[in-house]
Design a protein with these regions (language model features):
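Short beta-strand->loop
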Residues: 100-111, 257-273, 282-284
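Conserved C-terminal helix/tail region of periplasmic/extracytoplasmic solute-binding proteins
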Residues: 338-369
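Ligand-binding "clamshell"
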Residues: 94-102, 119-120, 126-128, 219, ...
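Hinge/lid segment of periplasmic solute-binding proteins
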Residues: 69-71, 91-136, 155-156, 161-164
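Early extracytoplasmic/lumenal segment of secretory-pathway proteins
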Residues: 21-93, 230
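C-terminal motif of bacterial Sec signal peptides marking the signal peptidase cleavage site
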Residues: 15-18
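Ligand-binding pocket segment of bilobal, Venus flytrap-like solute-binding proteins
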Residues: 178-190, 194-266
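Mature extracytoplasmic/periplasmic domains
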Residues: 277, 282-346
Length: 369
């Protein structure tokens, strides 16, 4: 089954779950591990290999948005043992006791992690000791080279002006521009473009970014965190805000569909966010020992390699990186060089009032009011 079909299937399963289904659950006496992860984050056959090698059964669920995780975990008794979660959002849940610290003594494969990469990724103090890193990347934009150059032959593509300058974006409206439907991904990039603090939540900064986004709103086809994964490979968009690995995924899906397309990925010179997904164990996990066995399995170099190669997201596993193709290791969209990394920033968690203020900005922009 292709990745495209899996995404559609995962979305359908989530919809069914929202209609009354329960997540994977089980008593602590069962020899299972209940896992909740992003769609397309584990390579085919990996789960089956874990079950075969350990004798531990895996109940594996996927999700499309981080908000889904928050609802399940804050409600309590989710039944999950292992959850892959964005470190920024996970830090909020740690504050209210949702996650427990991992036992590093049970994770000998931590030795495979690259100390230098780990130093660069160590941007959230609040999650230290609570996870093992899984994948990481940047937030930028993917663009169709041919479609953009037809309309803007001389436009520099190292700037977020391609997204936020009305004069430029208006010339791309006919071929399609999409924005993230996420305050944690959209607003920091927009604030950085205005030369403001990307984590600003003060009234003046939010008013400025809202005004700018409303100016380009007529030229934005839609706001979504995943629809562009279907539309970009089919040439139904020419520019899409995206996470770094999705650029490579879009190319792969185009190849699978036999579509000839030239895509590129840019990290804006004004700045872009860095994100990190960690693997967490909920405080009320029913199978904590099995959870550690699963975490250690994911840290194995051969398994980390397969998952990184399949998902097209960067891995912090040094042993696994050595197994990747030279083209992948040298792909600046997946593994940015030091110059590109100097332009990325961390996004900070905010309190409920600040989050509501940011959410109101996005809601007004989406409605065009």
């Amino acid at each position: 089954m292709t990745k495209l079909i899996r995404i559609i299937a995962s979305t359908m399963l989530l919809a069914l779950a929202a209609c009354g289904g329960d997540p994977a659950t089980g008593t602590g006496s069962e020899n299972v591990v209940n896992v909740y992860n992003w769609a397309d984050a584990v390579a085919p056959g990996v789960i089956e290999q874990f079950e075969s090698e350990t004798g531990i059964g895996v109940n594996y669920d996927t999700y499309a948005t981080s908000a889904t995780i928050d609802v399940k975990l804050l409600t309590g008794n989710s039944g999950y043992d292992v959850i892959v979660h964005d470190n920024l959002l996970a830090s909020r849940l740690i504050e209210v006791g949702v996650y427990q610290k991992v036992d590093r003594e049970q994770l000998p494969n931590l030795k495979n992690l690259d100390p230098e990469i780990m130093r660069q990724l160590d941007i959230y103090e609040s999650v230290r000791g609570y996870n093992t890193p899984y994948h990481w990347g940047t937030t930028g934009f993917t663009w169709n080279v041919d479609l953009v150059r037809e309309r803007l032959p001389d436009q520099p593509m190292d700037t977020a002006a391609i997204l936020f300058d009305p004069e430029i974006v208006s010339k791309l409206a006919d071929c399609g521009v999409s924005f993230f439907d996420s305050v944690t991904s959209l607003l920091p990039m927009a604030l950085a473009y205005l030369d403001l603090d990307p984590n600003a939540v003060d009234e003046e900064s939010l008013a400025a970014v809202q005004e700018m986004l409303l100016e380009v709103r007529p030229y934005v086809r839609y706001f979504s965190n995943d629809k562009y994964l279907l539309d970009m490979p089919n040439k139904e968009l020419c520019v899409a805000m995206s996470w770094s690995g999705d650029y490579a995924n879009a190319i792969q899906r185009s190849n699978e569909a036999g579509i000839d397309i030239d895509l590129a990925y840019s990290i804006p010179k004004e700045g872009a966010g860095m994100w990190i997904d960690g693997i967490y164990i909920p405080t009320d996990a029913p199978h904590v020992k099995n959870a550690h066995v699963f975490l250690n399995f994911l840290l194995r170099e051969d398994i980390a390699f397969r998952n990184a190669d399949y998902s097209n997201y960067a891995t912090p596993n040094a042993a696994a990186i050595k197994l990747l193709s030279i083209d992948t290791r040298n792909n600046p969209a997946i593994y940015p060089d030091q110059e590109a990394l100097s332009r990325v920033f961390r996004t900070d968690p905010h309190g409920p009032m600040q989050e509501r203020a940011r959410t109101r900005v996005l809601a007004r922009v989406k409605s065009g009011l």
